[in-house]
């Protein structure tokens, strides 16, 4: 019986310590475990976001599923995850499905991304028009000579990361508006495979998210991976170097680069738990700086402190 009191005291002390230090088993905005689904085209950005979040909050564990965008929405609608990262917002019927479970999703714009067109470094073309892109995707243009009379004759092969990806959905819905000849295109498993294949196969045009090809060693984000060539895109039917733009952050901001899309965090968590905490982190100054460094455009410009010397 004499051991009872010390044992109770020890249990109370342990409980108090866990309360003050953070309970690793309790789901709060900064602790616990959650599973999220991220469109694979945003993987480089959110690998960095989750890594820093978990480094700061040691009792947090974010299990991330990098999947095609269609699968991410299915996981959310099936109640398998409470948070997804996607390039579009929920449709009305999808919101109704989630509402039927007494859940009310919040959708937050956190970044602007771009779809880059990449080719083999030996490709003679450097610019392409939106009209030509639509005709490529619609099957009207099938040969390199149709893009540029200086090109050697040969079939243009279109390459995507996955047939269910957000890139394919964006091109089909927002660019082609339904006139999308998917039979001519090839799909691999992920963006990394698209880059590797395009870098070693002339005659291919690959479609990838900009964060996959951004040169992390370039602090100004004015260059891309040297293993591939990035095409400049023009809104004009007769493109010129002066009217064509690469997916640099400045051209995402003013929408001069035409293939710009949004990045949303869609959170259906019933109360403020770890998923909600991660959403807050991504939209915070730290989270937005990670997005800025990745080569795409943060929705909120991170604060920048500048020291002004009085003697200047």
Predicted regions, residues:
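Signal peptide-directed extracytoplasmic domains
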Residues: 97-110, 126
